[in-house]
């Protein structure tokens, strides 16, 4: 039993007997693993000797002769120290090898997760899931994706693939070579020579020396094997550490590009139009958002980079809808995702929106939106009263629309038909002008008091996409059956939550944009009639 225990303690099989420490590094990312690598002490295999000093050589002469008993005690002491030093070195190397092996496995796992093949499969699967959910809950198909300016994912994956392949060619080259491999080769040759002459031993002393030499040589082989394995593992760690940092940087750039250009648009459409999705689809969308969350958004804020729209946009759903011609300048634009039922008004509302010239709005307006001349006049009065101060000497807008002045007594007589109140005793009749004559009489005076401005006849500057689009989502009155729509094709025209203006500070430009947004919503009702379920 003692010989078996001694053989197992010094054998090469005992090197792999220690348990791995992979559980402690399982949840670490690249940054934490890099900091952990810098804290590891590699002096156990990087230096020659770290343990107890060797015994004195035989060339060191003693000052005085000693007895045989004292010499045996000294020899036994040196042998115990030698054995203890070798065992301590083996235990230290085993612990170090177990630790760096766990770190290497975690680095390898992270590198495989960020490899080209894994990332491509995962991102393509997420994009496909989003497209399937939009097709399930809306009327958008693959053709609509091109019409609203969503690019292909392959354009971004090709850039990531090229950078990742160049990164994987890196290899760490340490300054000192692996000298333990050469020593291990020499020690194994000595071990084979020693065991070949085993049958030639006759005396007990030779057999004792053979057993001692074999045990010590076996321990040296184990130590050199451990140090060689630690050296190779440490080299792999330094290689994968650099590769992992570069792959993580490229992976974050890819996630940001895919989210801002493709998946953010899908997520916004899903949030706005999919009111009651299934639980499985909702969980799937949340997992997609969480995958891109660390690099593409902050809590409660999703950033979107919108690409310029094409010059000519045609709706694939209906051929009856007129053609819309949109001309945009190449100005980078950005918008902000808002959660459902949360709409903000931006204070910068100076950019006007042109009316498409090829649209016949009389055919697309609903009966509720057709206004009489008098109602249009009241709308113009409200627009002017928001920015211009009414002169104190002039009557209010509501007062200017009353009938011509008639004495109160006469009106009273007319209302109750009081013949006794009349001075002549006869019924008094009042000739009132008809509605058309009153309108013609009031309109010139109204134009003199408040100059009428034809906003549609004013010259419009060329339309461009500003850096922050005013966040207006038009709504339809409760009496109308038409659901609220967003202006097409710019589905995501919202602004940051911080840019909010009070309602009483709305400018005529904003009111003009409000009217045109409503007209555009009515025009595009046919394209999005299936989105509301």
Curated annotation (Swiss-Prot):
The keyword Lipid metabolism does not apply. The keyword Magnesium does not apply. Signal peptide: none annotated. Residues 61-85, 373-384 have a biased composition (Basic and acidic residues). It comes from the Eukaryota. Residues 359-372 have a biased composition (Polar residues). This is Calcineurin-interacting protein 3. Its main location: nucleus. Disulfide bonds: none annotated. Residues 1-30, 53-85, 359-404 are annotated as: Disordered. The gene is cnp-3. One of its GO terms (cellular component) is nucleus. The lineage of its organism: Eukaryota, Metazoa, Ecdysozoa, Nematoda, Chromadorea. Keywords: Nucleus. It is found in: Nucleus.
């Amino acid at each position: 039993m003692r010989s078996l225990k001694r053989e197992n303690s010094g054998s090469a099989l005992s090197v792999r007997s220690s348990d791995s420490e992979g559980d402690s590094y399982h949840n670490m990312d690249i940054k934490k693993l890099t900091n952990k690598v810098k804290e590891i002490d590699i002096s156990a295999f990087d230096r020659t000797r770290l343990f107890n000093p060797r015994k004195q050589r035989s060339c060191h002469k003693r000052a005085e002769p000693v007895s045989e008993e004292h010499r045996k005690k000294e020899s036994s002491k040196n042998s115990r120290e030698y054995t203890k030093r070798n065992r301590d070195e083996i235990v230290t190397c085993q612990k170090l090898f177990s630790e760096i092996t766990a770190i290497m496995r975690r680095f390898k796992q992270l590198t495989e997760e960020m490899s080209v093949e894994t990332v491509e499969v995962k991102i393509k699967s997420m994009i496909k899931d989003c497209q399937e959910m939009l097709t399930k809950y809306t009327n958008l198909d693959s053709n609509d994706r091109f019409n609203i300016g969503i690019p292909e994912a392959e354009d971004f994956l090709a850039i990531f693939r090229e950078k990742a392949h160049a990164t994987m060619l890196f290899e760490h080259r340490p300054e000192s070579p692996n000298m333990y491999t050469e020593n291990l080769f020499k020690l194994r040759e000595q071990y084979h020579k020693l065991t070949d002459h085993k049958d030639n031993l006759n005396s007990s002393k030779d057999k004792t020396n053979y057993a001692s030499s074999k045990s010590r040589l076996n321990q040296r082989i184990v130590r050199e094997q451990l140090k060689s394995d630690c050296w190779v593992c440490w080299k792999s760690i330094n290689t994968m550490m650099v590769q992992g940092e570069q792959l993580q940087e490229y992976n974050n750039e890819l996630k940001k590009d895919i989210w801002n250009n493709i998946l953010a648009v899908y997520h916004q459409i899903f949030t706005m139009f999919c009111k009651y999705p299934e639980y499985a689809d909702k969980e799937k969308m949340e997992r997609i958002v969480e995958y891109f969350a660390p690099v593409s958004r902050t809590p409660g804020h999703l950033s979107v980079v919108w690409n310029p729209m094409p010059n000519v946009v045609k709706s694939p759903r209906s051929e009856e809808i007129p053609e819309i011609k949109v001309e945009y300048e190449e100005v980078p634009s950005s918008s902000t995702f808002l959660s459902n039922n949360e709409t903000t008004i931006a204070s910068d509302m100076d950019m006007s929106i042109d009316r498409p010239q090829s649209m016949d709005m009389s055919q697309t307006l609903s009966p509720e939106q057709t206004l009489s001349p008098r109602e249009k006049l009241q709308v113009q009065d409200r627009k002017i009263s928001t920015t211009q101060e009414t002169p104190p000497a002039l009557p209010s807008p509501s007062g200017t629309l009353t009938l011509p002045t008639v004495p109160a007594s006469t009106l009273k007589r007319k209302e109750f038909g009081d013949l006794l109140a009349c001075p002549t005793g006869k019924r008094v009749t009042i000739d009132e002008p008809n509605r058309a004559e009153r309108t013609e009489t009031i309109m010139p005076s109204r134009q003199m008091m408040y100059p009428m401005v034809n906003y549609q006849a004013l010259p419009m500057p060329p339309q461009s996409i500003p850096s922050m689009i005013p966040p207006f989502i038009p709504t339809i009155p409760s009496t109308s059956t038409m659901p609220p729509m967003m202006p097409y094709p710019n589905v995501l025209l919202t602004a940051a939550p911080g840019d909010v203006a009070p309602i009483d500070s709305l400018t005529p430009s904003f009111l003009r944009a409000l009217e045109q947004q409503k007209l555009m919503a009515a025009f595009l009702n046919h394209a999005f009639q299936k989105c509301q379920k």
